[in-house]
Regions:
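PLP-dependent amino-acid enzyme catalytic core
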Residues: 1-231
Length: 231
């Protein structure tokens, strides 16, 4: 209710990095973390831009778009990675792990985001991205190695890479960073909270379209709105 609206609104001007970005909604995402575990790279709080008259005419309806391309690695995946890697940092500190391998299958965005956030955790994380050979754009291919990740290109498609990642996660101390990781979904719930806050906590009458991919993102957004309904 009003308590939560006031709390989240009050954080709009905070200078504490740990409670900026997606962690403005800390209590809804990851209340087990200490502030020292939270990784903030400027993700989240992206603007909602009204479409131009030309775009509205082409689509046939008035609409606006949330520009998540302004996130650090240029995609909405950064929301989930901020949460997932903050959790990993917390786990490593709590259990004093000296080495954890992070791995993901990707056609571009996921590997870029995972490598970037892993680089800010540093040791004990090692990072590997599995990409389908020839299926990643030239613009996205340099992003993971640019953040220090090892990139392995495998024959086949994304699903073939994902099978390898799942096998590794099931049999070794490996952190899977695809959307099967529930901490990824929690971080991406922030999309829903930001939309609601942007519109003064009243989203009645709005229809929201989101990138779907393998449905992890739409699951996160729906979960976020359902949580808000309960509050």
């Amino acid at each position: 209710g009003q308590y939560w609206r006031d709390l989240f609104d009050s954080r709009a001007s905070t200078r504490r990095n740990a409670l900026r970005g997606v962690f403005r909604y800390y209590e809804l995402l990851a209340p087990i973390f200490d502030e020292e575990d939270i990784i903030y790279l400027g993700e989240g709080l992206t603007p909602i831009i009204e479409a131009s008259d030309f775009m509205k005419e082409k689509v046939g309806i008035p609409f606006a778009f949330k520009n998540d391309g302004q996130n650090p690695s240029a995609s909405f995946k950064d929301r989930g990675m901020a949460c997932a890697f903050s959790y990993l940092k917390w786990l490593c500190r709590r259990h004093q792990w000296d080495e954890v391998l992070t791995v993901c299958a990707s056609t571009g965005d996921t590997s870029a985001a995972a490598a970037l956030y892993a680089s800010y955790v540093g040791a004990p994380l090692k990072r590997v991205a599995l990409l389908p050979h020839g299926k990643v754009t030239p613009q996205q291919l340099p992003q993971p190695p640019g953040s220090g990740a090892t990139v392995l290109e495998l024959p086949g498609v994304f699903d073939d890479c994902m099978k390898v990642v799942e096998h590794l996660a099931e049999n070794y101390r490996v952190a899977l960073l695809n959307s099967k990781n529930s901490w990824r979904i929690l971080g991406q719930e922030s999309y829903a909270y930001e939309v609601a806050q942007w519109y003064g906590w009243d989203v009645s009458g709005l229809c929201i379209f989101v990138p779907i991919g393998n449905a992890g993102n739409i699951t996160a957004v729906m979960s976020g709105f359902l949580k808000m309904l309960e509050l």
